[in-house]
Design a protein with these regions (language model features):
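A short helix->beta-strand "capping" segment at the edge of beta-propeller domains
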Residues: 22-50, 102-114, 158-159, 226, ...
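Beta-strand-rich domains and repeat architectures in extracellular enzymes and scaffolds
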Residues: 41-90, 125-126, 358-363
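Blade-loop segments of beta-propeller domains
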Residues: 70-135, 139
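Loop/turn-rich, solvent-exposed surfaces of beta-rich toroidal or solenoidal domains
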Residues: 11-20, 279-351
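Conserved beta-strand positions in repeat-built beta-propeller and related beta-rich domains
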Residues: 58, 64-74, 135-142, 184-195, ...
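Blade-level signature of beta-propeller repeat domains, shared across WD40, Kelch, NHL, RCC1
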Residues: 301, 361-388
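Short, conserved, GDST-rich strand-edge loop motifs in beta-rich repeat architectures
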Residues: 66-87, 138-140, 187-209, 298-334
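Beta-rich, blade/repeat-based domains predominating
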Residues: 49-58, 115-130, 166-183, 191, ...
């Protein structure tokens, strides 16, 4: 009897993981079936930007805001990369993607004001509140996990630090979805962190254990201190979060190869309603034209892990010059892979970009009025842009 139960449980587990296990074979670099539906595309600022995981579009201004962290090559809490030595920090940038007018095409770093820990700034998710011109940024600082809050002057392109948000439930924050100027959901991508329990974190990832969390936070409107905090959902590898509509929250489940859809209850609790199964591992989710999910992620987990572990060698000329022949060959032969798809209730899932010309895709954004799209890469140089 016990053996029967064990076999049944194992069969159920393997079935639930079959599409992810299949991706290890079907999406390997030599087998990945590539596609690119974008005709007029360009990688911009490859000589100035690297490792820009997330971005937001301010469509009325035709302005993209992104955070780029070259230090991710040596410090990645999610993937367990910890290389000793000097660690560069992240910066905030504004890209004016207009095709005409003052400043069109310019990339400008924000001047950071009043941020005492600016050298310990290692960014992941971004969320912007237009009503108060406030930017929320998840920060995997060496000093501990936190959310940084900045007031932006979009004319002067300054970012004045307003607060650092910490809380016992903010353990490994990844993505943010605002519900108002002082209310938000935050995803914690793991329960076990690679800093404190590397083996357990790896087991949690590869078995897709539903231990990661989505936390609801209510903040004080004057100083952003936490008034209330509670876990409202648990799932495997909670990554990007986005409101599909007023009553539905989408949460990427990276290690499960899926996006979970939740009903948002009146008290901000979440009730799981359905799962979107994917042929790749999703990173971030965004909304296109108010009704379609843009899902961005990684085709092949083993390749992504290898790519992440090699960046501190491949992107540092001095280290690369002193590297072994094997390491240099790895840098030349290890591609970054990307997968972008869109999903809607009406049309289902449709892949729109499966490529290695721009790798490690993490976020895709679309401004339909301007006919402008952008992909940001977790471990890539520059921003992939296209126009229609």
């Amino acid at each position: 009897m016990a053996l029967t139960v064990l076999v049944a449980a194992l069969a159920t587990f393997l079935y639930s993981r079959s599409h992810v296990l299949n991706s290890f074979v079907a999406n390997a670099p030599g087998r990945l079936a590539k596609m690119n539906t974008f005709e007029n595309y360009e990688v911009k600022f490859a000589d100035r930007l690297r490792n820009c995981e997330d971005a937001v579009l301010l469509t009325e201004r035709q302005l993209a805001i992104t955070a780029c962290d070259p230090g991710r090559d040596k410090w990645n809490v999610v993937m367990g990369v910890y290389v000793p030595g000097h660690l560069p920090h992240a910066e905030l940038f504004a890209y004016n993607y207009a095709t005409s007018g003052p400043g069109a095409g310019n990339l400008t770093p924000f001047q950071i004001i009043g941020f005492p820990n600016a050298t310990d700034f290692h960014t992941l998710g971004l969320e912007f509140d237009e009503a108060t011109s406030t930017l929320f940024v998840t920060n995997h600082a060496q000093a501990g996990p936190r959310i940084e809050i900045f007031r932006l002057d979009l004319d002067a392109l300054t970012a004045t630090h307003a607060a650092t948000l910490t809380h016992p439930l903010i353990t490994i924050p990844n993505s943010i979805q605002l519900l108002g100027s002082h209310e938000l959901y935050v995803s914690n991508d793991h329960y076990f962190t690679t800093r404190e329990a590397p083996l357990l974190s790896k087991i949690e990832t590869y078995l897709a254990l539903p231990l990661a969390s989505v936390v609801h936070l209510a903040l004080d409107p004057t100083d952003y201190t936490v008034q209330s905090a509670r876990v409202v959902a648990r799932q495997a590898f909670a990554n990007g979060v986005a409101l599909l509509n007023d009553s539905t929250l989408a949460v990427a489940s990276s290690s499960a190869g899926a996006v979970q859809l939740y009903t948002v209850d009146a008290d901000r609790s979440l009730t799981r309603s359905r799962q979107i199964t994917l042929p790749f591992l999703p990173d971030n989710v965004e909304i296109k034209d108010g009704r379609t999910l843009l899902i961005t992620g990684h085709p092949h987990l083993p390749s992504l892990a290898k790519f992440a572990q090699s960046r501190h060698v491949c992107n540092d000329p001095e280290v690369l010059a002193a590297a072994s022949d094997e390491e240099r060959a790895m840098c030349a032969s290890t591609p970054g892979l990307s997968w972008v798809a869109e999903w809607s209730e009406e049309h289902g899932l449709r892949s729109i970009f499966v490529e290695s010309i721009y790798g490690s895709s993490a976020t895709t954004l679309w401004d339909g009025k301007a006919g402008f799209g952008l992909i940001a890469g977790l471990y890539e140089k520059g921003l992939f842009t296209w126009r229609v």
